[in-house]
Amino acid sequence: MAVGKNKRLTKGGKKGAKKKVVDPFTKKEWYDVKAPSMFAVRQIGKTLVTRSQGTKIASDNLKGRVFEVSLADLQNDEVTFRKFKLIAEEVQGRNVLTNFSGMSLTRDKLCSMVKKWQTLIEANVDVKTTDGYLLRVFAIGFTKKRNNQVKKTCYAQHAQVKAIRKKMVEIVSREVSSNDMKEVVNKLIPDSIGKDIEKSCQGIYPLHDVLIHKVKVLKKPKFDVGKLMELHGEGSTTTSKGVTSEGGEKVDRVDGYEPPVLQNV
């Protein structure tokens, strides 16, 4: 018979008492994410954050979050291959105000455009907007057959590719450097820059599927709450006798109106 302690008898019970299960969601709260006024749909979703406690403030944890949203959801559109990045810059009440932070195409759209028997032409350029944003803009285009062409391939010569790339850089630089960020985003939504490039390059070589396929924000100007509020259509529209609704329309307020007292803050 083996000599030793019987572990089952000497042990008082299971190691450690049963811990109380705490639902982590009880310490969190939801915030509404608002898109800038350039887009048709302003309410793009909700985000979760831990409640303010001691020195840890909820709004500080929200600032800097990046939300990637399909343009179809932002514009109530069927074109789904463009994605916009929106960065949280300010928190007002339960609303998170965002600003443009980048744009890209979906992977499947890029893959579907690349085919045999044609030349792919890419260009990128760093441009500064009038309000101080430094953007890196990437353009892409593909050659296509000329009218009544019998030949299967439509390869462009090296000199033609260089000329088209130069034209791309010129048009992108002109369109971005002469506008502020709001106007640039308004051009990116329908991709009017890509259409201008396609039209201008017809004399060099016919192109199709000319798109701005990516935009990166390299540098931003110093943060200004006033400019962000203007971007959201809430800067100069509020008056003493009127308030601005979520869609940007002025709503008359009754004289002597006071907001209801909140029970919990």
Curated annotation (Swiss-Prot):
Basic and acidic residues: bias regions: 247-256
Keywords: Cytoplasm, Ribonucleoprotein, Ribosomal protein
SMART domains xrefs: Ribosomal_S3Ae
GO molecular function, one term: structural constituent of ribosome
PROSITE patterns: RIBOSOMAL_S3AE
GO cellular component, one term: cytosolic small ribosomal subunit
Family annotation (HAMAP family): Ribosomal_eS1_euk
Protein name: Small ribosomal subunit protein eS1
Species name: Aplysia californica
